[in-house]
A protein has these predicted regions:
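The alpha/beta-hydrolase serine catalytic core
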Residues: 1-87, 92, 97-100, 104-110, ...
Length: 118
């Protein structure tokens, strides 16, 4: 459901034809290009999760940038809802982007990972 909403439905007809024909299309995002395969799109359609429930009592931590233009924060909130555990949290990094790769954001990610491991 994510890939259709966030990618496929935004592709032009030309892009859809190309990815079906070649099996891959390169999407430009900022200074980088990312290969998106048609297999990824098909797998996303087969593996829908938002209508499922995960009942294991496990710790779940999701980290998301508030300024993520690729995947809006609402999707992390939706995914978090499928976990029935009471030990779940969403950490929204203020002004964080999709990659969360700045030193400041990496420090937050490292802190959250340490909390999970310990």
């Amino acid at each position: 459901e994510f890939l259709d909403k966030l990618m496929w439905n935004k592709f032009s007809n030309k892009m859809k034809i190309e990815i079906k024909k070649k099996g891959v299309i390169n999407l430009k995002h900022g200074d980088y290009e990312y290969p998106i395969t048609y297999q990824l799109i098909k797998d996303g359609r087969k593996n829908k999760i938002l209508n499922k429930k995960i009942s294991q009592n496990i710790n779940v931590t999701m980290v998301h940038g508030s300024k993520d233009k690729s995947v809006p924060v609402i999707y992390s909130k939706k995914v978090l809802k499928i976990f029935q555990s009471k030990k779940k949290k969403l950490v929204v990094i203020k002004n964080g982007d999709h990659s969360l790769s700045s030193p400041k954001w990496l420090k937050i990610l490292k802190k959250e990972l340490k909390l999970i491991i310990n």
